[in-house]
Amino acid sequence: MKATLVLGSLIVGAVSAYKATTTRYYDGQEGACGCGSSSGAFPWQLGIGNGVYTAAGSQALFDTAGASWCGAGCGKCYQLTSTGQAPCSSCGTGGAAGQSIIVMVTNLCPNNGNAQWCPVVGGTNQYGYSYHFDIMAQNEIFGDNVVVDFEPIACPGQAASDWGTCLCVGQQETDPTPVLGNDTGSTPPGSSPPATSSSPPSGGGQQTLYGQCGGAGWTGPTTCQAPGTCKVQNQWYSQCLP
C-alpha cells in the first residue's frame, strides 16, 4: 500500500488540531460504503473533481462502533493539509507542506491486515497516529505517505451528488463518527512539529470563507466574513459557507 496525497488546488481553511497518516490504493472494488457495483467502483471514485478525492478511512473515521459496512462515517468529507513529513524516515518521502485536498470516505481500511497503518478505535498505528486515510488514486497525488492535519468539512456539491449514487445513502450506522479526541499524533523522529499560529484570521475577528467558526472546543472566531454564514456541520465543526 503506497501513500499518496493530492497536489490539488490549495483550499483555504482553519488549522486542524488532528493529524493522520496517509497512503494510496486502487483495487477497483465497490468498497464498504456501497459506492459501485459487483463489476467495480464508480469512475468518480478516482477523482470527484479538482482536489477532491475518495478514501478508505481507518475504523475511527469509518464507524466508531465497529461496523464494517455502511459505517456512520460513509459520505463524510475532510480537508487534509500536508505537513510535508512522512511518519518515519523509512516509510515514505513526505511532500510539500501546506498543500491541501478534500477526501470523502467511501471505504474502510480495517485494522485486520493493515495494522501498520490503520488503527483500531482508541488505538494507534505503528507510527503512533490514531487516524489514517488510504486515498484512492493510481498515481501519487501530493506526496509519498505524507502526515496530514485534517478537519471535517461540508462536502462540495459534486461530492454530495456523487455520494447520492451509493448504496449506503440513508443506511449508515448512527453512532457519532468520528469522535475526534485531543490526540495530535506523533512527530517523526528527528523532526519538529509544524509551527502553527493561535492568532485569529484577519478581518476584525471574523473567519474567512470555508474556515472553521465553531464546534466543541473551538476558541477562534465565530462570525464569518461576507458573504459567509456560520453553519453547523456536526457537534465538532461549524464552517463559514456562502
UniProtKB/Swiss-Prot annotation:
Listed GO MF terms: cellulase activity; cellulose binding
Domain of life: Eukaryota
Glycosylation sites: N182
GO CC annotation terms, alphabetical: extracellular region
Entry keyword Glycoprotein: yes
Keywords: Carbohydrate metabolism, Cellulose degradation, Disulfide bond, Glycoprotein, Glycosidase, Hydrolase, Polysaccharide degradation, Signal
Signal peptide positions on this chain: 1-17
Catalytic reaction annotation: Endohydrolysis of (1->4)-beta-D-glucosidic linkages in cellulose, lichenin and cereal beta-D-glucans
Chain ranges passing through the membrane: none
Full protein name: Endoglucanase-5
The organism of origin for this protein: Hypocrea jecorina (Trichoderma reesei)
